Amino acid sequence: MTATRLSVMTAVLAGLLSTGSVLAQHEGHEGHAGHDQAPAAKTPARVGDAYPFATCPISGKQLGTMGDPVVKVYDGREVRYCCGGCPKKFEKHLQQSLAKLDEKIAADQGPIYPLKTSLVTGKDLPEKPFEFVYGNRLIRLGAEQERAEFAKAPAKYLATLDQAVVGAQGKGYPLKECPVSGEKYGGDMGDPIDLVVAGRLVRVCCKDCKKDVEKDPAKFIGLVDAARKGEKPATHEGHEQHKGQEGHGGKDAGHGHE
């Protein structure tokens, strides 16, 4: 009888120990579950302007024809692609790809560059200034040595460049209405807001419209360029078009006046 009772007690204890071991292992796995899930990668912050062109730098296709553009940021530099397959091709030889993009930006923004002086020193630019692209903006300096000074406060110098663009293009600005909404400047929306995109002044009627320009900068660059050449601008979307989408006064608007 004693032997039987000892056997039963031994079996019960063994069962309890086994159950405790299983529970401990299960808790251990739960504790490690969080470790298996890597934290979501943060999108690098963009510096300067959005990607200014309407086409993919790899395929040459119009952005948006294959769905929403794929956006990548390289050391603060934004590039947009037509599809998910193009970034790998661009990144295979990243420096060469960026250099090619720099050439395109310099060719595009060079003719409308507003300053004849170095952005850093304020001295007259030489016949062949030192040029580079920062944050998708063309920068001209008197000499390469000035680039180190620019790097200390790039936001400050970009703001100075923006002011120069507004000063150079503001007086003869070709549009009388906001290119996004079609609202006349200075109406119920108040004073217009001056944006600088890829070296162009883009004047909008309100803060809501800034986000539309940010979403598709090439579209509005094209509208301003066409108007400057005397061409009739394309039909604007209008504020009513944005109601219920992104904005202008809609009840479920994604953004409103700040």
Regions found by a protein language model. Give the residues of each.
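Intrinsically disordered, low-complexity terminal tails/loops enriched in metal-binding residues
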Residues: L6, G15-E258
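Bacterial N-terminal signal peptides that target proteins for export
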Residues: M1-T10
